[in-house]
Amino acid sequence: MLRRSLVLFAALAAILAPSAAATRHASAFPVTIHAANGDVVVKTRPTRIISLSPTGTEDLFAVGAGSQVIAVDNDSDYPKGVPSTSLSGYTPNVEAIAGYKPDLVVVSNDIDNVVASLQKIGITVLLEPAADNLAQAYDEIRQLGSATGNVPQATKVVSGMEKAMTKILRSVPKAQRHQTVYHELDPTYYSATSSTFIGRIYKLFGFKNIADAADTTHSGYPQLSAEYIVASSPDIVVLADSVCCAQTAASVAARPGWSGISAVKHHRVIAVNDSVASRWGPRIVDFARAIAAVARKK
């Protein structure tokens, strides 16, 4: 009899658990998110989310809101199996977006005043722009966790990232923290300075970015010359054009005059996934880990 009662209790608990979780999520609303487009009130837990931001998509799935996402833009390619569509974050079509009947739209740019246009027809929008640093990246993850009713998981994600980054940064000996770095965006030598998000990651390691001195317009993304790069002889070369443009350590070594560069001679040329290097979501930890591994090479 006791055994049967325990079985019935367990079965009842299993049935009630989803309901209890739903109630717990619902009780967190309404919630006010202090986003880039002002204080946004999310009245109820969203179940029809559209993400027009590749980083936003990664953040949403990381915090456990994947099942709440019904559509993502055509540049969102991670994680595997995201509900890809022809929607664009760069040329947003308000009518097409509205056709999905979303209760929350996440964007990283307010192109063509898409935020106001969507809000005008009653759609809640969160503007989560490109982060300038890790602190901002963490804040956006927390905001999306709050906006979707996934605060515990968002907190866990951020905590995990913070701990991982601390460990990764400490893994590089002090003697190797003063290396010079060249971050390549494309084969025409566009780069990123220390004023950019990715540049600040290098700065955390203590690296000196060769693009800084060449950024005369202070754009953050100067175009360098082959001669300048060769003369600078960076200790580390990071290829963020490996997917788009098939650049590799071998192709870099084959460039005229590049075989004498410190990074080439000491095998510190690394090809990274373009998407990972251009986003500010959870996978930035993977990027930092790869950079640390190259930096430790003697």
Predicted regions and their residues:
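His/Asp/Glu-enriched short active-site or ligand-binding loop at hydrolase and phosphoryl-transfer sites
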Residues: 195-220, 271
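Bacterial Sec-exported substrate-binding components of ABC uptake systems
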Residues: 2-5, 17-55, 152-183, 293-298
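Short helix-initiation/N-cap motifs at beta->coil->alpha
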Residues: 35-37, 85-95, 215-226
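Structured C-terminal subdomain patch of bacterial secreted/periplasmic proteins
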Residues: 113, 136-137, 141-146, 155, ...
